[in-house]
Protein backbone atom coordinates (compact mmCIF):
# COMPACT_ATOMS: atom_id res chain seq x y z
CA UNK A 1 0.00 0.00 0.00
CA UNK A 2 1.29 3.45 -0.88
CA UNK A 3 0.06 5.52 2.05
CA UNK A 4 1.77 8.69 0.82
CA UNK A 5 0.03 8.45 -2.55
CA UNK A 6 -3.39 7.94 -0.94
CA UNK A 7 -2.88 10.82 1.51
CA UNK A 8 -1.80 13.05 -1.37
CA UNK A 9 -4.80 11.99 -3.47
CA UNK A 10 -7.15 12.46 -0.50
CA UNK A 11 -5.51 14.68 2.15
CA UNK A 12 -8.64 14.30 4.29
CA UNK A 13 -7.42 10.84 5.33
CA UNK A 14 -5.32 12.86 7.79
CA UNK A 15 -8.55 14.17 9.36
CA UNK A 16 -9.19 10.67 10.77
CA UNK A 17 -7.72 10.80 14.27
CA UNK A 18 -8.00 7.07 15.04
CA UNK A 19 -4.81 5.68 13.46
CA UNK A 20 -6.14 2.11 13.17
CA UNK A 21 -9.27 3.37 11.41
CA UNK A 22 -7.24 5.57 9.06
CA UNK A 23 -4.91 2.70 8.16
CA UNK A 24 -7.76 0.24 7.51
CA UNK A 25 -9.56 2.82 5.34
CA UNK A 26 -6.43 3.48 3.31
CA UNK A 27 -5.90 -0.26 2.90
CA UNK A 28 -9.50 -0.67 1.68
CA UNK A 29 -9.03 2.03 -0.93
CA UNK A 30 -5.72 0.55 -2.06
CA UNK A 31 -7.26 -2.93 -2.32
CA UNK A 32 -10.16 -1.54 -4.38
CA UNK A 33 -7.71 0.13 -6.77
CA UNK A 34 -5.59 -2.99 -7.16
CA UNK A 35 -8.63 -5.25 -7.59
CA UNK A 36 -9.78 -3.47 -10.74
CA UNK A 37 -6.65 -2.17 -12.40
CA UNK A 38 -6.83 1.45 -11.29
CA UNK A 39 -3.37 2.93 -10.76
CA UNK A 40 -1.67 6.17 -9.77
CA UNK A 41 -1.61 7.04 -13.46
CA UNK A 42 -5.27 6.44 -14.28
CA UNK A 43 -7.16 6.93 -11.00
CA UNK A 44 -8.35 10.37 -12.13
CA UNK A 45 -10.07 8.66 -15.10
CA UNK A 46 -12.60 6.90 -12.85
CA UNK A 47 -15.94 8.63 -13.47
CA UNK A 48 -18.49 9.29 -10.77
CA UNK A 49 -21.11 7.77 -13.07
CA UNK A 50 -21.55 6.23 -16.50
CA UNK A 51 -25.30 6.76 -16.37
CA UNK A 52 -25.39 10.44 -17.37
CA UNK A 53 -24.30 11.73 -20.77
CA UNK A 54 -21.30 14.06 -20.77
CA UNK A 55 -20.76 13.93 -17.00
CA UNK A 56 -17.26 15.33 -16.53
CA UNK A 57 -17.03 14.75 -12.77
CA UNK A 58 -14.42 12.22 -11.70
CA UNK A 59 -14.71 9.80 -8.80
CA UNK A 60 -11.77 11.56 -7.10
CA UNK A 61 -13.49 14.95 -7.42
CA UNK A 62 -16.80 13.57 -6.14
CA UNK A 63 -15.26 11.81 -3.13
CA UNK A 64 -13.22 14.92 -2.32
CA UNK A 65 -16.30 17.16 -2.52
CA UNK A 66 -18.45 14.83 -0.40
CA UNK A 67 -15.71 14.50 2.21
CA UNK A 68 -14.97 18.24 2.40
CA UNK A 69 -18.68 19.07 2.66
CA UNK A 70 -19.15 16.44 5.37
CA UNK A 71 -16.26 17.87 7.38
CA UNK A 72 -17.49 21.45 7.00
CA UNK A 73 -21.09 20.54 7.83
CA UNK A 74 -20.06 18.32 10.75
CA UNK A 75 -17.92 21.05 12.26
CA UNK A 76 -20.79 23.52 11.89
CA UNK A 77 -23.64 21.27 13.03
CA UNK A 78 -22.00 19.31 15.88
CA UNK A 79 -23.13 22.04 18.29
CA UNK A 80 -26.74 20.90 17.87
CA UNK A 81 -25.92 17.27 18.55
CA UNK A 82 -23.83 18.23 21.58
CA UNK A 83 -26.60 20.50 22.83
CA UNK A 84 -29.06 17.61 22.64
CA UNK A 85 -26.67 15.05 24.13
CA UNK A 86 -26.44 13.05 20.90
CA UNK A 87 -23.22 11.21 20.10
CA UNK A 88 -21.92 12.07 16.63
CA UNK A 89 -18.59 10.53 15.53
CA UNK A 90 -16.44 12.78 13.33
CA UNK A 91 -13.96 10.01 12.45
CA UNK A 92 -16.86 7.83 11.29
CA UNK A 93 -18.23 10.65 9.13
CA UNK A 94 -14.83 11.33 7.53
CA UNK A 95 -14.02 7.64 7.01
CA UNK A 96 -17.47 6.99 5.58
CA UNK A 97 -17.28 9.97 3.25
CA UNK A 98 -13.88 8.87 1.94
CA UNK A 99 -14.98 5.26 1.41
CA UNK A 100 -18.66 5.59 0.52
CA UNK A 101 -17.95 5.07 -3.20
CA UNK A 102 -14.91 2.73 -3.16
CA UNK A 103 -17.11 0.13 -4.80
CA UNK A 104 -17.14 2.32 -7.90
CA UNK A 105 -13.54 1.21 -8.39
CA UNK A 106 -14.95 -2.25 -9.16
CA UNK A 107 -18.23 -1.13 -10.73
CA UNK A 108 -16.21 0.80 -13.33
CA UNK A 109 -12.97 -0.57 -14.77
CA UNK A 110 -10.44 0.62 -17.34
CA UNK A 111 -11.56 -0.39 -20.82
CA UNK A 112 -9.25 -2.51 -22.97
CA UNK A 113 -9.52 0.05 -25.78
CA UNK A 114 -9.25 2.99 -23.39
CA UNK A 115 -11.91 4.84 -21.48
CA UNK A 116 -13.99 3.31 -18.73
CA UNK A 117 -16.51 0.49 -18.90
CA UNK A 118 -18.78 -1.30 -16.45
CA UNK A 119 -16.99 -4.04 -14.55
CA UNK A 120 -18.01 -7.66 -15.06
CA UNK A 121 -20.14 -7.83 -11.89
CA UNK A 122 -21.64 -4.34 -11.83
CA UNK A 123 -25.22 -5.62 -12.16
CA UNK A 124 -24.78 -8.25 -9.45
CA UNK A 125 -22.81 -6.13 -6.99
CA UNK A 126 -23.52 -2.44 -7.26
CA UNK A 127 -20.94 -0.19 -5.64
CA UNK A 128 -22.52 0.00 -2.15
CA UNK A 129 -22.32 -3.78 -1.77
CA UNK A 130 -18.94 -4.30 -3.45
CA UNK A 131 -17.53 -1.37 -1.47
CA UNK A 132 -18.83 -2.76 1.82
CA UNK A 133 -17.30 -6.16 1.02
CA UNK A 134 -13.93 -4.61 0.15
CA UNK A 135 -13.94 -2.47 3.29
CA UNK A 136 -14.80 -5.47 5.46
CA UNK A 137 -11.98 -7.51 3.91
CA UNK A 138 -9.58 -4.66 4.73
CA UNK A 139 -10.62 -4.76 8.39
CA UNK A 140 -12.59 -1.50 8.36
CA UNK A 141 -14.91 -1.10 11.35
CA UNK A 142 -18.46 -2.40 10.93
CA UNK A 143 -20.03 1.05 11.41
CA UNK A 144 -18.10 2.32 8.37
CA UNK A 145 -18.96 -0.83 6.39
CA UNK A 146 -22.62 -0.20 7.28
CA UNK A 147 -22.37 3.39 6.03
CA UNK A 148 -20.92 2.24 2.70
CA UNK A 149 -23.62 -0.41 2.28
CA UNK A 150 -26.59 1.91 2.92
CA UNK A 151 -25.46 5.19 1.34
CA UNK A 152 -27.40 4.72 -1.92
CA UNK A 153 -30.94 3.58 -2.74
CA UNK A 154 -30.06 0.12 -1.43
CA UNK A 155 -30.33 1.70 1.99
CA UNK A 156 -33.75 3.28 1.46
CA UNK A 157 -35.50 0.82 3.78
CA UNK A 158 -32.55 -0.06 5.99
CA UNK A 159 -31.55 1.09 9.43
CA UNK A 160 -29.37 4.21 9.21
CA UNK A 161 -27.00 5.48 11.88
CA UNK A 162 -26.86 9.23 12.37
CA UNK A 163 -23.52 9.27 10.57
CA UNK A 164 -24.73 7.17 7.63
CA UNK A 165 -27.76 9.44 7.21
CA UNK A 166 -25.49 12.46 7.31
CA UNK A 167 -23.01 11.21 4.68
CA UNK A 168 -25.83 9.87 2.49
CA UNK A 169 -27.59 13.26 2.47
CA UNK A 170 -24.40 15.12 1.54
CA UNK A 171 -23.55 12.51 -1.13
CA UNK A 172 -26.98 12.84 -2.75
CA UNK A 173 -26.69 16.64 -2.76
CA UNK A 174 -23.19 16.62 -4.29
CA UNK A 175 -24.18 14.01 -6.89
CA UNK A 176 -27.28 15.97 -7.92
CA UNK A 177 -25.14 19.09 -8.36
CA UNK A 178 -22.72 17.04 -10.50
CA UNK A 179 -25.33 15.86 -12.99
CA UNK A 180 -27.77 18.79 -12.91
CA UNK A 181 -28.71 19.72 -16.46
CA UNK A 182 -27.33 16.51 -17.96
CA UNK A 183 -29.36 13.84 -19.74
CA UNK A 184 -29.63 10.38 -18.21
CA UNK A 185 -28.60 7.51 -20.51
Question: Where are these predicted regions, by residue range?
Answer:
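Generic detector of short, locally flexible boundary/turn motifs and exposed helical patches
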Residues: 31-32, 60, 129-134, 139-140
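Divalent-cation-assisted or electrostatically stabilized phosphate/pyrophosphate-binding catalytic cores
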Residues: 114-137, 165
Amino acid sequence: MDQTFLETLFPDFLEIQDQALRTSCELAMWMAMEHSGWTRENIHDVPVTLNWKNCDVSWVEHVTDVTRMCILEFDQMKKYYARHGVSFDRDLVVAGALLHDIGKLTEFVPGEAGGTVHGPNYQLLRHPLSGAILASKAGVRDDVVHLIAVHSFEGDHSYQTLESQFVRTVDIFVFQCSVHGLEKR
